[in-house]
Amino acid sequence: MYLITLPSFVKITKDWCAITKYTFLVNPQSSSGSGEKVWNKIEPELKRRRVAYRVLFTTPECGATETVRRFTADKRRHTLIVLGGDGTINEVVNGIADVSKITLGYIPTGSGNDFTRALNLPTKPLAALENVLNPGRLVPLDIGCAKLDSVPRKFAVSSGIGFDASVCHFVEKSSFKAFLNRIHLGNLIYTGVALKRLFLDSRVDAEVILDDGEPRHFSNVYFAACMNHPYEGGGFFFCPEAKTDDGMLDVLVAADIPLPKVFLILPTAFFGKHTGFSGVHIFRCRKVEIRAKEPLAMHTDGEPAAVGTVLKTEICKEQILLMVP
């Protein structure tokens, strides 16, 4: 059963599980091997319930983007269940040939899980599987399109330039990431790297152009985040008003803030209370162009993407259907 006409939501019939064939895309190495452990819990339940499915495993030689690109090349309708972290979701949306033909389910295994927060998706493996087999509804989900110094990328949660992307770049290089993920303390590496980058990274001047309007000038910019979801960075509630289906981007610019004040503001961002501080600017737009005076790190969904001076983002034309409780 595939439902493509999109009102505000699509109700699911009781026969959903019985008449749907699922394709599971499994990243075994997600969160330092947690993906494989989660799949080992999921597969016996699928067999016990006699669910029709097939499974595709990512490998170092063929990651999620290439695996999904090959799988969706036929441009037929598919029910695709992603088992991985926010990074796997990012790879998947960059590999789908035609998002309008995909019904997406998600079983999270990562440490950040920003994708699940705004959508209230289950995080426990068997609860997430139940949502996939018996979803309450299908909701349309926006996908972001970014150009990072002319390099095109898509994103599900957010794209950014500056401090937040710098943290992503250095976390990816850290030798401690795998160890902390194994002991379920993966977020600690982000905290440690973030504190270090606050002291070491330089702030730059930048222009922000909203919807082809006049440039807005900002001095001493820490970072700019283009948000499709309200959360990024492992739970920072950066854009509390962001909606995942409104065709709009919420843009946060943090600029000209004394460093001691940054340490005061950052903890409040977990609760969305940072928005009242001077130096924190939030805008809503359909597209945005950010021009930095010097090269800065850039990311999509927390994945290091490029180092450059120009980041352009907008919401893609087509939405993807997502299974939610």
State what each model feature region is.
Residues 35, 210-212, 237-325:
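ATP/nucleoside-binding phosphotransfer catalytic cores, i.e., glycine-rich phosphate-binding loops
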Residues 164-167, 216-218, 231-235, 259-262:
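Short acidic/glycine-rich loop or secondary-structure boundary segments that cap or lie
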Residues 49, 56, 98-105, 110-220:
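Catalytic core of DAGKc-family lipid kinases
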Residues 1-80, 90, 127-129:
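ATP/NTP phosphate-donor binding region
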Residues 88-99:
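Short Gly/Thr/Asp-enriched flexible loops that form oxyanion-binding sites at enzyme active sites
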Residues 160, 164, 223-238:
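Glycine-rich phosphate/pyrophosphate-binding beta-alpha loops
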Residues 28, 83-85, 109:
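Glycine-rich beta-strand-to-loop/alpha-helix junction loops that act as flexible
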